[in-house]
């Protein structure tokens, strides 16, 4: 086997590295409710435009 064969990885099926933010491409805290697939930073920016309201 060549060294290049060791660098190929299969795609992740679960965990933090399995999903990316659809807006910025960041891995990590993804909000998946209603199929949003946004990280929490992007969600905070676009939530009012999507119709989400912040209650105290």
Curated annotation (Swiss-Prot):
PROSITE patterns: RIBOSOMAL_S14. Binds 1 zinc ion per subunit. It comes from the Archaea. Its cofactor is Zn(2+). Binds 16S rRNA, required for the assembly of 30S particles. Part of the 30S ribosomal subunit. PANTHER family: 40S RIBOSOMAL PROTEIN S29. This is Small ribosomal subunit protein uS14. It comes from Thermococcus kodakarensis (strain ATCC BAA-918 / JCM 12380 / KOD1) (Pyrococcus kodakaraensis (strain KOD1)).
């Amino acid at each position: 086997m060549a060294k290049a064969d060791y660098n190929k990885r299969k795609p992740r099926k679960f965990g933090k590295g399995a999903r990316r933010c659809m807006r910025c491409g960041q891995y990590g805290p993804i909000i998946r409710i209603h199929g949003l697939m946004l990280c929490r930073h992007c969600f905070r920016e676009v939530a009012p435009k999507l119709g989400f309201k912040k209650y105290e």
